[in-house]
Amino acid sequence: MVSQTVSVAVTGGTGQIAYSFLFSLAHGDVFGLDCGIDLRIYDIPGTERALSGVRMELDDGAFPLLQRVQVTTSLHDAFDGIDAAFLIGSVPRGPGMERRDLLKKNGEIVATQGKALNTTAKRDAKIFVVGNPVNTNCWIAMNHAPRLLRKNFHAMLRLDQNRMHSMLSHRAEVPLSAVSQVVVWGNHSAKQVPDFTQALINDRPIAETIADRDWLENIMVPSVQSRGSAVIEARGKSSAASAARALAEAARSIYQPKEGEWFSSGVCSDHNPYGLPEDLIFGFPCRMLATGEYEVIPGLPWDAFIRGKMQISLDEILQEKASVSL
């Protein structure tokens, strides 16, 4: 039985990530099995026919939680009174593309979306940004939507966390459930910081199971950092199904939190407990509180290796921010 209904917008509705994500959303993976969904699916003008096909498939899926499905090429209609938005629509990264190319193209897209959110969405709407460069895109959207709460903007680092989680599980030869406190700091890029020093395996420090520090620093970390490029090289397209799953999990951690769960998210750095510059979107380890709000987990130590990587990632985010004219 549906106990409440949330209004949700998904952009890039005819794209590969959205195609996978929409069915997970409709199934209840994000908001729960008792939460109805008033779903608005947006894509750019010219995609009307493809949007109608997406709607047909959702109708044919006979999802009990879908209270309404609207497809639209109007951002105003998509964002009107929403509780949550998943900003998936963007130019995907292809072989040989540089981050600066993506920043120019996708920055314009999210600026327009931010302005539309500012005029139509609920003030406390939660905004999840996916398109790359995701930290800076999220920052652009946030700054074009000053009416909305800055703390509710999230850049997706969950795919990086999942990649690291899987690699540690394989290396330790333990189930995924045995690995916890997997943390990714900083920018979602090749300069992200997969912080293995916080991880636990069977609730014990990781070094007790994976004693090979050289593997952690020089194999695992670069592998996580470059995994997106490896996927593009292998399949000729950027990650889609795994990105959709990561997005659903990222939102689930907020809407259906598990007690004690840590999750990585790119959030506003204002008043952060690590003394990092404010007015950035920076990847932090987070956890949910009983109040329904998240907090950046304070007091985690950085060893020399992690501290050095953190500075590199911070510098990249600052450089990207400096290249943007709001």
From Swiss-Prot:
Molecular function GO terms recorded: L-malate dehydrogenase (NAD+) activity
NAD is among the record's keywords: yes
Task: Cite a single Pfam family from the UniProt record.
Answer: Ldh_1_N
Which top EC class is given? oxidoreductase
Protein role:
Catalyzes the reversible oxidation of malate to oxaloacetate.
Q: Which Gene3D superfamilies match?
A: Lactate dehydrogenase/glycoside hydrolase, family 4, C-terminal, NAD(P)-binding Rossmann-like Domain
Query: What protein name applies here?
Result: Malate dehydrogenase
The residues responsible for catalysis, as annotated, are H188
Could you mention a single GO BP entry for this protein? malate metabolic process
| HAMAP family assigned | Malate_dehydrog_2
Q: Which reaction does it catalyse?
A: (S)-malate + NAD(+) = oxaloacetate + NADH + H(+)
